[in-house]
């Protein structure tokens, strides 16, 4: 998501606050629990939508990406690493996160202000060539989360199968000689 933020700032330099730098904004995304107080502390999905409100006067690029990052952080319980015996995130939540990124990608492509201009410039035609790098980047994130959700779902199914086999094995009582 840091890469997406850099690309959005390069395409929408007016969104970067004067007192900040791209590097500072990217570093702010790396904190496991994002500070969203500059936006009034909204829920992550509200923050993504806020970037496309006509009356919003803040940093639309950061609001959009920080909302996505906050959603992803929430799915992973605001953790950056997992150890072998740790509980992993629920497959359904990871799957839902991928769908949320799809929705955000759609909003990025389609939302326009009252004068017909996009709130955030992203994909578009430049010099007669389609630049779909934003959609590709978001598609990559969606694909990674889909693959992870499938792997987690299979892990859960294996665990359920192991529990069922374990329970079935206790049907027979041990006999001594």
Task: Label the model's feature ranges.
Residues 1-65:
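N-terminal Sec/ER secretory leader and immediately downstream segment
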Residues 44-177:
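Mature extracytoplasmic/lumenal regions of exported proteins
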């Amino acid at each position: 998501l840091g890469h997406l933020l850099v690309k959005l700032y390069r395409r929408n330099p007016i969104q970067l606050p004067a007192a900040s730098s791209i590097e500072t904004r990217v570093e702010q995304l790396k904190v496991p629990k994002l500070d969203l107080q500059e936006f009034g502390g909204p829920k992550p999905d509200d923050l993504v939508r806020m970037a496309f409100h006509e009356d919003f006067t803040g940093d639309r690029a950061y609001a959009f990406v920080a909302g996505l990052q906050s959603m992803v952080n929430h799915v992973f319980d605001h953790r950056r690493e997992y150890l072998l015996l740790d509980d992993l995130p629920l497959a359904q939540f990871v799957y839902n996160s991928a769908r949320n990124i799809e929705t955000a990608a759609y909003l990025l492509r389609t939302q326009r202000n009252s004068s017909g201009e996009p709130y955030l410039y992203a994909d578009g035609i430049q010099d007669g060539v389609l630049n779909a790098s934003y959609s590709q980047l978001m598609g990559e994130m969606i694909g990674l989360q889909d693959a992870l959700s499938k792997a987690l779902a299979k892990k859960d199914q294996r665990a359920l199968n192991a529990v069922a086999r374990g329970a079935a094995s206790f049907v027979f009582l041990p006999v001594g000689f």
